[in-house]
Amino acid sequence: MVYLKSAREVEQIRQACKIFQEAKAYFTIERLLGKSLTAIDQALKQFIESKGATCAFHKYQNFPGFNCLSLNETVIHGIADNRVFGVKDKLTLDIGINLNGYICDAAFTVLGPKAPEPMQTLLEVTEACFTAVVEPQLRPNNPTGNVSHAIQTYFESKGYYLLKQFGGHGCGIKVHEEPLILNYGKPDTGTKLEPGMVLCIEPMVMTDSDAMVMHNNSWNVLTPKSRYNCHVEQMYVITTSGFECLTN
């Protein structure tokens, strides 16, 4: 069942999302480069707690970390460890924030200064998809399948592959709510968008294959047949006239 948020609830979720925006602005390449994933996770935790919030992912479905830190071959759900973010690396920071019971779930990807050019291009294309194809679909009465199909068409037209086993979702009161919004789909199918829906849209993109495997830690999702991958996640609320992006 889809839970529609009231204006008051949307404002509380908006405040949680502001902490994400502040974290994204604070954790620049200079602050991340040369640090272990564990150190980054702890620094993120301290930053979030300094804003009066908590880490929404910690212990959620028994997740052991505080945030999902996905380095290189890990596309999503990475558990922090002692590996170091280096000059040629990709790192996705998927941050869950619980502010007084209201949730922000959003992610951004950063690259070391010597990251390969194909990885740079992939990140640019992924970031651009939100304004290019996602946001034009975010309006009342438009079915979620149109959002999914727009994402699929956009990336496949550029020769990329999409992770099929995971997708976007409702959010705001719980980390994961209905509806599920996959990154592929058929037009005019799924749940119709309504004002008050809060949605996470999160393309997970690979350069060479849509194959994935689970790490033996049961969390890290790996892309062994793809040289590069990328994950970016934004949160939106559907309004009577269209949408508001809560995280950008």
Swiss-Prot record:
Its EC number is 3.4.11.18. Binds 2 divalent metal cations per subunit. Has a high-affinity and a low affinity metal-binding site. The true nature of the physiological cofactor is under debate. The enzyme is active with cobalt, zinc, manganese or divalent iron ions. Most likely, methionine aminopeptidases function as mononuclear Fe(2+)-metalloproteases under physiological conditions, and the catalytically relevant metal-binding site has been assigned to the histidine-containing high-affinity site. PROSITE patterns: MAP_1. The keyword Methyltransferase does not apply. Substrate binds at H77, H176. It is an enzyme of class 3 (hydrolase). The keyword Protease applies. Keywords: Aminopeptidase, Hydrolase, Metal-binding, Protease. Pfam families: Peptidase_M24. InterPro entries: Creatinase/aminopeptidase-like, Pept_M24, Pept_M24_MAP, Pept_M24A_MAP1. It comes from the Bacteria. A divalent metal cation 1 binds at D94, D105, E233. Belongs to the peptidase M24A family. Methionine aminopeptidase type 1 subfamily. Removes the N-terminal methionine from nascent proteins. The N-terminal methionine is often cleaved when the second residue in the primary sequence is small and uncharged (Met-Ala-, Cys, Gly, Pro, Ser, Thr, or Val). Requires deformylation of the N(alpha)-formylated initiator methionine before it can be hydrolyzed. NCBIfam families: met_pdase_I (TIGR00500). This is Methionine aminopeptidase. It comes from Mycoplasma pneumoniae (strain ATCC 29342 / M129 / Subtype 1).
